[in-house]
């Protein structure tokens, strides 16, 4: 019986230790929120600008493993700016708007006047910080997600520019960490960001 217990514990140890492997990993970031299509009109969406310093344009975060090696996570497509631009478009479309990609526009009221012709609203965004830091501790993984964005909403009928700073830090502990759980963590956070920041 003692021998069987030792074998069982050995299997559990190998499972906990061996499930994680260092290196590059990729996750899908998208928008899953459900909305009633109560809005109408055309929205122009400019590309998000990534202002993070010394980070790859697709970088999302990392996880430190038990042996201090590291998994590094990137968004599929290797372009976080393009991903967030696409997600904002999905958010507006799920609320009933139609969307069109537009060129970057001057982030001033004059810029709104020049760029918003034919649109109900125009949108731009800036990534100041976006990183998930995770550390494996035995069978669990502690995650800290920092998101800092600046959203710009140009309202055409008022020729007005609304600047919307968004900053949040979220923490979560997962008993069994997987790529899908990291995706869920990030996607839920972004859903909260856009639903609270871009209110109609």
Q: Model-derived features: where do they sit?
A:
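C-terminal/domain-edge helix-coil "capping" segments
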Residues: 19-41, 96, 141, 152-200
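Feature marks short, surface-exposed loop/turn motifs that line or immediately flank catalytic pockets
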Residues: 52, 131, 170-172
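Bacterial N-terminal signal peptides that target proteins for export
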Residues: 1-7
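Bacterial N-terminal signal peptides
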Residues: 8-17
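A structural "domain/chain start" motif
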Residues: 19-91, 197-200
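Surface-exposed short loop/turn segments
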Residues: 20-30, 104-159
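Short beta-strand->alpha-helix linker/helix-N-cap micro-motif
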Residues: 89, 93-111
């Amino acid at each position: 019986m003692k021998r069987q217990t030792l074998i069982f514990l050995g299997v559990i140890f190998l499972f906990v230790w061996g499930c994680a492997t260092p290196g590059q990993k990729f996750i899908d970031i998208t928008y899953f929120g459900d909305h009633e299509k109560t809005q109408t009109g055309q929205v122009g969406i400019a590309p998000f600008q990534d202002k993070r310093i010394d980070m790859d344009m697709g970088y999302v975060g990392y996880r430190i493993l038990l042996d201090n090696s590291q998994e590094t996570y990137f968004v599929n497509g290797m372009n976080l700016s393009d991903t967030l631009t696409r997600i904002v478009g999905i958010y507006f479309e799920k609320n009933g708007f139609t969307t069109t990609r537009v060129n970057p526009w001057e982030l001033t009221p004059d810029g709104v006047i020049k760029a918003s012709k034919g649109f109900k609203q125009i949108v731009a965004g800036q990534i100041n910080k976006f990183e998930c830091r995770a550390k494996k501790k035995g069978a669990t993984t502690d995650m800290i997600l920092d998101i800092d964005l600046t959203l710009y909403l140009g309202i055409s009928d008022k020729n007005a520019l609304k600047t919307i700073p968004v900053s949040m830090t979220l923490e979560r502990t997962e008993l069994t960490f997987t790529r899908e759980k990291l995706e869920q963590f990030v996607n839920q956070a972004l859903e909260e960001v856009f639903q609270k920041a871009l209110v109609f």
